[in-house]
Amino acid sequence: MRLLWGLIWASCFFALSLQKPRLLLFSPSVVRIGVPLSVAVKLQDAPSGQVVRGSVFLRNPSHVNELCSPKVDFSLSSDRDFILLNVPIPQAQARICFLHLRRVPEVQLMVQSSWLRDSLSKQTDMQGVNLLFSSRRGHLFLQTDQPVYNPGQRVRYRVFALDQKMRPATDILTVTVENSQGFRVQKREVFAPFSIFQDSFLIPDISEPGTWKISARFSDSLDSNSSTQFEVKKYVLPNFEVKIIPENPYILTTPGFLSDIQVIIQARYIYGKPVQGVAYVRFGLLGEDGEKTFLRGLESQTKLVDGQCQISLQKAEFQGVLEKLNISTDDLPGLRLYVAAAVIESPGGEMEEAELTSWRFMSSPFSLDLSKTKQQLIPGVPFLLQALVRDMSGSPASSIPVKVSAKLFSGSTSKNQDFEQNTDGSGQVIVSIGVPRTISEVQLSVSAGSPYPAVGSLTVKAPLSRSSGFLSIEWQNPRPLKVGETLKLNLQAVGISGSFSYFYYMIVSRGQIVSVHREPRSHLTSISVFVDHHLVPSFHLVAFYYHGGVPVANSLRVDVQAGGCEGKLELNVDSSKAYRPGDTVKLNLKTESRALVALGAVDTALYAVGGKSHKPLDMVKVFEAMNSYDLGCGPGGGDTAPQVFKAAGLAFSDGDHRTEIRKSLSCPKESKSRKKRNVNFQKAIHEKLGQYTSPVAKRCCQDGLTRLPMARTCEQRAARVQQPACRKPFLSCCQFAESLRKKARTRGQVGLARAMELLQEEDLIEEDDIPVRSFFPENWLWKVEEVDRFSQLRLLLPDSLTTWEIHGMSLSKTTGLCVATPARLRVFREFHMHLRLPVSVRRFEQLELRPVLYNYLDSDLTVSVHVSPVEGLCLAGGGGLAQQVQVPAGSARPVGFSVVPIAAAAVSLKVVARGSFDFPVGDAISKILQVEREGALHREEMVYELNPLDPLGRTLEIPGNSDPNIIPEGDFKSFVRVTASDPLEALGSEGALSPGGLASLLRLPQGCAEQTMTLLAPTLAASRYLDKTEQWSMLPPETKDRAVDLIQKGYTRIQEFRKRDGSYGAWLHRDSSTWLTAFVLKILSLAQDQVGGSAEKLQETATWLLSQQRDDGPFHDPCPVIHREMQGGLVGSDETVALTAFVVIALHHGLAVLPDKNSEQLRRVENSISRANTFLGAKATSGLLGSHASAITAYALSLTEAPEDLRRVAHNNLMAMAKDIGDKLYWGSVTTSPSNVLSPTPAPRSPADPIPQAPAMSIETTAYGLLHLLLWEGKAELADQAASWLTRQGSFQGGFRSTQDTVVALDALSAYWIASYTAEEKGLNVTLSSLGRSGLKSHVLQLTNHQVHRLEEELQFSLGSKINVEVRGNSKGTLKVLRSYNVMDMTNTTCQDLQIEVTVMGHVEYTMEAEEDYEDYEYEDLLAGDDPEAHSRPVTPLQLFDGRRNRRRREAPKAAEERESRVQYTVCIWRTGKVGLSGMAIADITLLSGFHALRADLEKLTSLSDRYMSHFETEGPHVLLYFDSVPTSRECVGFGAVQEVPVGLVQPASAILYDYYNPEHKCSVFYGAPRKSKLLSTLCSADVCQCAEGKCPRQRRALERGQQDLEGYRMKFACYSPRVDYGFQVKVLREDSRAAFRLFETRITQVLHFTKDARATADQTRNFLVRASCRLQLEPGKEYLIMGLDGATYDLKGDPQYLLDSNSWIEEMPSERMCQSTRHRTPCAQLNSFLQEYGTQGCQV
């Protein structure tokens, strides 16, 4: 009995304990540092009148005494038992409590109240729950001005910063940019005071295609990272877009059934008009892994009608093709049908392409989504199955029958229920299934659609039975709600044995508890929730009650259709209006409140070139970002209350029950597995590629399949492949493609289907290689406007015919962020004109302008077209003469005008087209035609030291010597620069910190990695000098910003050359170089603070360098950039000293980025430097070092503070090699080859002589010597002397000879100038004067050593004139002279060592029989007139492949024109065996006028495995070809070029081959157009030719015709008009071609008159020049009377040369036999009388 009473008492006590009072604690399961935490506190089961006070706070689980937030007090009572608190979490307090030191991101939410201990008899007054914490907070949205960019373009971007509530946030942001390889190229911290940050950066022009990323985060929140991506690829905007539109979004296939396959090909111009032309369509299959197999025999060639055509595949035909591939229709579901279409428009022959890759074979036309159905049953409550049915386009499918089969289990028994219901307008169906209380499990099978349904299944179970019951949330019509609507629900307790008073519920949205509520319980408890913007885009309703001390809960997830932003932003233009280029458009901006509106306009053509995957920011993306803070997982519900709370994203504790801490910030993802299909694709090329498994081998095979633009056998090509592993697959695939091409040719033009069986071109070319064409601007309107409810902008439209999309984003303090629906406007002219001009032409070349007229009106037009008169151009009728052209409706017609430029200038061409009176249409285009002078540009530089303290140096005379090759009537210019401050000139805003950086200091290209580093190195030296001497104020205010920009550009660009292991190669495809990697490590270590680079990445670079060190200390270079043996080093076989010293210098600078002093890597680097120094010291001690190796070794040992004895030996060796000239000290060069010994620099004869300019090697060596001397003795006499010599070696631009000598010299001089800086001010007065044709010209300059004054006065004077300089003052200075003029010949070059030859041939078709190479199909050859049906022969895939690779023009000419306008360039280079190069060589080819090189050809020469060049660049009319070396035997490369605008009488152009590191070592030649080419014929009409020849001389033939000189016309010409300067009777000896001139060498037989040619006597020779475009012919052996004006040029002997022009008298002297005839006797006597009178008496006036 006692036991029984004990049990009864215990049970009663237990029941009472369940009803005990308690505190309930709710909060989001993740804490956001810096964002207030919403905490709900509830008092449960407390007696009436009870008041509980306490506080809530956060703490560190490991440091419980360290609070991570302030304490927030609360007070609860039985009447106010459920409240919501906000607990602030300041960033500073989170750091103080050491949260950042925790390995696991956990924090404790605690409630503290004495009531917990006093009333509940607990041992503590605290209760808590564990939460995760994250520093992610707020929202950052990024926007770029385009979705896709070309390499070399500038990216403009914006960052919008908002807080957790979507309101503007003014925080410090960290913005980073990553390139396509994932390397960080830019990092900066910025402050956005208006919550919008804008910036831009430049994509390097050598960037590989790929996806770049811009990321932003709040600087104090590492997890708040947000990013946007954009694509970088080579493209040109299309003129029209091709779309492939399937009739159905899927292809239905089931066993024994296949639906129809129909597709529409649509082509429209960007401005919306349909394209006329032909569509070529082919099909293939795409596997799940992206593998592509083409279906041979299904190709189609169809004419477009009104811009589109329909292609239908017959079932039998399609199934027959599948059977050939052993593919059954049963294998098709899960695969995709690939469709590729190429459209050629008939008016211009332009081609664009498109592909469709998303057309799936499906077993059902629908998809079934059951994710919104809850996973738990509530016994006795109807279960709601929610299914969403979509079609294959992803759109909701309405009115689709859905069948549901429910199998209900109760113990071992079951029963079935079947339902059928149609989906509503949103594609949703809700089926209510009655569930008796005894049911424990329901198995559901669902099918949607008929007869080929989508199916799905689901099993749901009931929780274990419990006395506390279940909470049912009834929503009669589940659907997404809209803002402003009210959610009405019923709450019901099911299966409960007792009673309770209230239901409690919470609204949770975006990871925060928005509100808490309680509702009295009734028979049917109804609650209402008003949906506002705070609940967008979804929220959770979490309801609970307590019964018997046990919480019972349920939840519901509700999606909200926002429909738009919280505020309002509308962009309105009058879209119904027809806009034309240059029109003003009114853009209306409407907002709900005052806001900043960020605008941008982008050409919609960008979305056609690959930008579709990077669409602009819209509200969908904004809502996705907002919803990313939702911590809930699933549709709601759970087996227990803690599970319900956890699934809704809440943490919960009541002292007895609590939620488990969540495992991660995101929801667990369902693991999905899918069986991969294995379809046997049998195809010739695929089988070939399938032989190789590695990506490298596949790439080599792909390269072998690609045809070169020049004749090479496969064996010759394979011999150039450097990697042995690549050579075999390359050769095999090359031979395979060669055999296919042979078959294609020998079989002739087979049908299209059979041709496709021979070769599938897509297997040879990546789709990314397909270029797209246009010349349109790509974006504009990048601005931020402040708008207060309404604003109207008046915008001027660009001159493009396209469709613009205007984007707008507003930021308001009251309504947050809003992204407007883009406004589109079409810019179009029904009648418009298109005109192309060449990059440049030369004087007296003839070109044909061919404006194309487009008529999109419904009526034919008669149009009058003319070219406006302009000075310097010869035009038909003098300009203004119009041509009448008939342009039919809906067509295009070209009009031809011949033009001859006769003046070297930038000429503004204006073409005007006007309609008739009945059709007042018109258009006008104005473009600049760049007209260059004949010949090639030649430059001369001289440097003088200005020293007024030396009496002999106070007066200088700069001679005016003349070059015999100078172009007559040229532009003779001398630029003079004077400075009294060498540091500020070299390092200031006009030198290393000029807008172009070192690029402006050197006339060298900027392609490879080492050239890229020159953007960084000099700028760092300049910044260091200006920082140390505090002289930034001496320069323009923007100079500091420019320096930062230059450093950032260099850093961004060099990352494109970085390899995964941290090393660097000269090119992207080149193996890593030790020397270059060391160079990068040194410069980036110095730039680390300014570029925000990754120290870890530089540590990887240092580690790679250590791996290149040998055991005995020296470093080796597996792939040298510079052949150091040619630049010093050791005499003998050891060439590693200079390299080892260079790496030591780099590693020393790299110590700054290594970890702390005790790190293993630091010890390894220090040990490496020590071993290398031991090696260097031993070599220095041997005494065999050359001057360069001695200088860099001495500097390396001094820099690293090597042992004293080693440093002293190196110093003594270096000084023993020094040379001195007066007060200057320098080091020359001793090389390994006696033939390469550079002669010592001669000493100047006097202070007034120009300073001799040393080679690059001497400059670099002296710079290292100066760096060593500064460390050895500081600023002392020796350093002064070396710096003085080095300063005077600078070029006119401020640089030196090449990159390395410039980089090292500026580094050394900046260090010297820092050491020698003085604030003392000194003055320098300079007077420059010269006597020219216009008289004496003088300039007076007053300079100081702290002022940069640059004079670039164009002193244009007759050659032979001199410049006198007078110097006064007490400061030294420098005077530099640059002469610039054009020359006719290249005889003064050094082509004895290096050789280059350029030949140009008319369009060449290589055939296997003739050239043992591949035939050259031209895609443009397919075009035969404007009628697409004229294509009588089908297009083979080989033509598509080869033609696409060659297509590079905007408007493809017809086949006949193509053969005339395309030429083949062959560039051959070689050197004599005794001459070496320092390293890289560059061929600079100036193309013939009007031509541009085919990039596709050049890319093949650089990108394939059989690489022929390292790199190429195109700039204007120049093509730069980079070669690693110049061979001793002749080696040639070839590429095609196309002349876009017809040019006649094309003049020769120049080509230069030079040593990059020693540019004076060069060979320069001229080359001309192919013989018998139309390029050499005339294009002009009669009056235009007459105008062009207006300056040409004409031979006088009056005597030949027997005309008598009754009026003395010879004497009038000689003495009155034009009154000549000379008169000679000469005999022509020979004729010679000189560029654009012809030279006649003559011997004087009689001197009649002279002015300045005082040395002219009989039997002397004189040269006469005439333009090659003139028709004058002087025959050798004949005598002529020649009179005219004096020339401005001189021959090699210093005698004047004469230009024959319209002011020249040229008359053939008659023979004695002619003068004996009766007809000519009197005229001959009159001629002899003139010769006698004029020769003895001259002019009598």
Curated annotation (Swiss-Prot):
Q: Which CDD domains match?
A: ANATO, complement_C3_C4_C5
Asked whether the keyword Cell cycle is assigned, the reply is: no
Which SMART domains does the UniProt record give?
A: A2M_recep, ANATO, C345C, Thiol-ester_cl
Alphabetical GO CC annotations of the entry are: axon; dendrite; extracellular space; synapse
Q: Which residues carry this modification: Sulfotyrosine?
A: 1414, 1417, 1419
| Isoglutamyl cysteine thioester (Cys-Gln) crosslink site(s) | 1008-1011
The record's listing under Pfam families reads: A2M_recep, ANATO, CO4A-B_CUB_C, NTR, TED_complement
What residues bear Phosphoserine in this entry? 916
Q: How is it modified after translation?
A: Prior to secretion, the single-chain precursor is enzymatically cleaved by plasminogen (PLG) to yield non-identical chains alpha, beta and gamma. During activation of the complement systems, the alpha chain is cleaved into C4a and C4b by different proteases depending on the complement pathway: C4b stays linked to the beta and gamma chains, while C4a is released in the plasma. The alpha chain is cleaved by C1S to generate C4a and C4b following activation by the classical complement system. N- and O-glycosylated. O-glycosylated with a core 1 or possibly core 8 glycan.
One Gene Ontology term of the biological-process aspect is:
complement activation
Quaternary structure annotation from Swiss-Prot or TrEMBL: In absence of complement activation, circulates in blood as a disulfide-linked trimer of an alpha, beta and gamma chain.
As a miscellaneous remark, the entry gives:
C4 is a major histocompatibility complex class-III protein.
Record's function text: Precursor of non-enzymatic components of the classical, lectin and GZMK complement pathways, which consist in a cascade of proteins that leads to phagocytosis and breakdown of pathogens and signaling that strengthens the adaptive immune system.
Provide the protein name.
Complement C4
